[in-house]
Amino acid sequence: MFDRKLTLSQVDPEVWAAIQKEDVRQEQHIELIASENYASPAVMQAQGTQLTNKYAEGYPGKRYYGGCEYVDVVEQLAIDRLKQLFGAEAANVQPNSGSQANQGVYMAVLKPGDTVLGMSLAEGGHLTHGASVNASGKLYNFISYGLDANEVLDYAQVEQLAKEHKPKLIVAGASAYALHIDFERLARIAHDNGALLMVDIAHYAGLVAGGAYPNPVPHADFVTSTTHKSLRGPRGGVIMMKAEYEKIINSAIFPGIQGGPLMHVIAAKAVAFQEALSPEFKQYAQQVAKNAKVLAETLVKRGLRIVSGRTESHVMLVDLRPKGITGKEAEAVLGQAHITVNKNAIPNDPEKPFVTSGIRLGTPAMTTRGFKEAEAELTANLIADVLDNPRDEANIAAVRARVNELTARLPVYGG
């Protein structure tokens, strides 16, 4: 038995104390890590329900356990809402992460050693798109494509590599690429060369849902995503696919790479998809893109370089070399000023991966807390103020005070 009256703070004061400190950090800091966001109270409430207790191997109506009649309702709501949100023919909401969603597609359509094209990690791709240190790069023969001389996705290179290597699958999508991706063109290249197309929109999903970024679903055979990041849901993954691939994808997820699904997380996914279907979310997605544009333009005015010259999404890579500071140091000093970013390699980066010449910035979280263009411009200027004098403690303290004033005015959960 457990004591129903005991709260978390009473059962485990150490964990409770860390959570309280993290709450303060999230309220006080400007969050600019492009992959982070703030889930709504409703999404978090769904994750803390009794659904965490339920095992439900299988799919709605076809479970290997009894007592699944109510979790069936929840999972079917998540599936139906996801399909409606993106216009998908079929969907699987069980992947526990974006990485597992990608792995599920690979399991479904590839054999070890098959050739795949994916965007180079060094030029904006993701670990699961064939990086040598990742299982994808160890199991399959990934050939990397990248950017052209103008730091735009090199579609001509993709086409040339597809003709030369005849891959089974082409993977599109990125973790650090600011511009629109021409999914229709990539689909044509893939299908003309006998390949399938998988698009990973983990970073762009919220913008796609809100009409602020191109939708790959009409063009791709498979679309994978996380449900957090710009979609503002719980941490997890999804796969959307053409109806003809539904059976093999479902089998690849369960029993292929996962057992019982996390039903409390699937409930939170359903809630997040419902939120994303609202007119307010469309406005949010548009504001994310507007804020990113202002952030990038202001940083350029302050002497920094944006990789690819601009952003057409929520994310941007900032080349710090004009300021003579590394990404590692910039991350640290901006953190002292209560501005949270992550160091990130830029194309052809001369620095080591743990040092880097750049930082990656994103606007989903700042927009969730109510930042608009004026706050985005101010944030960019505060970043530049720190980077202009990164070793001046008085300067960092002055910026931190202004950040604290701004975040107190626009709290996340109410302070």
Swiss-Prot record:
It catalyses: (6R)-5,10-methylene-5,6,7,8-tetrahydrofolate + glycine + H2O = (6S)-5,6,7,8-tetrahydrofolate + L-serine. One of its GO terms (cellular component) is cytosol. The record marks 228 as: Plays an important role in substrate specificity. Pathway: One-carbon metabolism; tetrahydrofolate interconversion; Amino-acid biosynthesis; glycine biosynthesis; glycine from L-serine: step 1/1. Keywords: Amino-acid biosynthesis, Cytoplasm, One-carbon metabolism, Pyridoxal phosphate, Transferase. The keyword Lipid biosynthesis does not apply. GO terms for molecular function: glycine hydroxymethyltransferase activity; pyridoxal phosphate binding. It is found in: Cytoplasm. Its cofactor is pyridoxal 5'-phosphate. SUPFAM superfamilies: PLP-dependent transferases. Pfam families: SHMT. InterPro entries: PyrdxlP-dep_Trfase, PyrdxlP-dep_Trfase_major, PyrdxlP-dep_Trfase_small, Ser_HO-MeTrfase, Ser_HO-MeTrfase-like, Ser_HO-MeTrfase_PLP_BS, SHMT-like_dom. It is an enzyme of class 2 (transferase). Its EC number is 2.1.2.1. The modification N6-(pyridoxal phosphate)lysine is found at residue 229. (6S)-5,6,7,8-tetrahydrofolate binds at residues 121, 125-127. One of its GO terms (biological process) is glycine biosynthetic process from serine. Catalyzes the reversible interconversion of serine and glycine with tetrahydrofolate (THF) serving as the one-carbon carrier. This reaction serves as the major source of one-carbon groups required for the biosynthesis of purines, thymidylate, methionine, and other important biomolecules. Also exhibits THF-independent aldolase activity toward beta-hydroxyamino acids, producing glycine and aldehydes, via a retro-aldol mechanism. Homodimer. Belongs to the SHMT family. This is Serine hydroxymethyltransferase. It comes from Bordetella petrii (strain ATCC BAA-461 / DSM 12804 / CCUG 43448).
